[in-house]
């Protein structure tokens, strides 16, 4: 039987997990749906809240607070391909599941994700300006990563045995593919609430950068080179003078987080589950996907 498995690693996500699950279940799909929530290292009632949502949901609890471990636990019981790995704090448009599944009708597609929609409604003007500049960049608009949702087929899953103990699981999987095997699916979206304070933004961006540096060090064979994506940024910005006022904030955040991430690498500090909590303080029910 055709189906679609979704694995959600969730660490202390009680404030958002119900809304995320309802968003997934409300998204139309022409096949069986299997949702696996792996509540890992939780000290709240994430698991109980996930079980309270009606639908084809299996909740697994593990005392180990690790996203890679949670992904591997979910993988062991997942039944279907395509198979998606989804953050616990996103909202999907009601056609996202079907659109992503349909992308795999192309025999060359190995990984697909809905178009990310970054929500920074109500943020202070300085942060809002930074986000407008950042999301205008070509490497952000066309990235598989960044939507909190990526789906893969069985052939791509066969290219690795299990998720390694690395922060950037999405980039690890993406870099096992060639560019022509990747699809950012238009006509559907996943909403990501952006950090609401500079402190949270710096922490999240440091974690992202740390994950990229960690992956480049651990898997040099994957040819991870984040510097390449910045080469066209000066020209991009030069042609968009309305973004110039936000360049100082962009440069500061880039330099600060890269330096902080390098220090963490040098000190071998683990940043697993360091995240933005500012966007989780208000129920996601108040932030519809469409």
Report each predicted region and the residues it spans:
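Terminal low-complexity segments of carbohydrate-biosynthetic enzymes
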Residues: 194-195, 203-290
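Catalytic donor/gating beta->alpha subdomain of glycosyltransferases that bind UDP-sugars
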Residues: 104, 118-121, 126-127, 165-226
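Short aromatic/hydrophobic "clamp" motif used to bind/position activated sugar donors
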Residues: 83
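Conserved donor NDP-sugar-binding/catalytic core segment of glycosyltransferases
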Residues: 94-125
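Short, well-formed alpha-helical segments that are part of the catalytic scaffolds
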Residues: 12-26
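A conserved acidic beta->alpha catalytic loop
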Residues: 23, 39-47, 64
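Acidic helix N-cap motif at the loop->helix transition within catalytic regions
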Residues: 15-19, 43-52, 95
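Glycine-rich, basic loop-to-helix element that forms the pyrophosphate-binding segment
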Residues: 61-78
């Amino acid at each position: 039987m055709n189906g679609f498995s979704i694995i959600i690693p969730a660490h202390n996500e009680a404030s958002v997990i119900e809304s995320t699950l309802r968003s997934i279940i409300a998204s139309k799909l022409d096949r069986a749906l299997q949702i696996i929530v792996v509540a890992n290292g939780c000290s709240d009632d994430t698991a109980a809240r996930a079980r309270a949502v009606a639908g084809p949901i299996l909740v697994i609890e593990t005392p180990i607070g690790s996203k890679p471990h949670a992904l591997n636990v979910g993988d062991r019981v997942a039944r279907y391909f395509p198979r998606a790995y989804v953050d616990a704090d996103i909202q999907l448009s009601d056609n996202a599941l079907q659109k992503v599944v349909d992308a795999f009708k192309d025999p060359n597609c190995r990984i697909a994700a809905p178009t990310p929609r970054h929500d920074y409604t109500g943020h202070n003007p300085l942060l809002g300006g930074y986000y407008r500049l950042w999301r205008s960049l070509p490497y952000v608009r066309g990235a598989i990563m960044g939507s909190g949702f990526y789906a893969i087929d069985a052939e791509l899953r066969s290219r690795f045995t299990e998720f390694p103990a690395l922060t950037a699981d999405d980039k690890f999987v993406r870099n096992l593919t060639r560019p022509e095997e990747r699809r950012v699916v238009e006509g559907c979206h996943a909403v990501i609430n952006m950090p609401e304070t500079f402190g949270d933004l710096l922490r999240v961006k440091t974690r992202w950068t740390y994950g990229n540096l960690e992956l480049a060090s651990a898997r040099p064979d994957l040819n991870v080179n984040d510097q390449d994506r910045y080469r066209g940024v000066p020209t991009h910005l030069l042609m968009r003078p309305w973004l110039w006022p936000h360049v100082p904030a962009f440069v500061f955040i880039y330099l600060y987080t890269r330096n902080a991430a390098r220090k963490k690498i040098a000190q071998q500090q683990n940043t697993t589950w360091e995240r933005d909590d500012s966007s989780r303080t208000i129920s996601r029910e108040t932030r519809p996907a469409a």
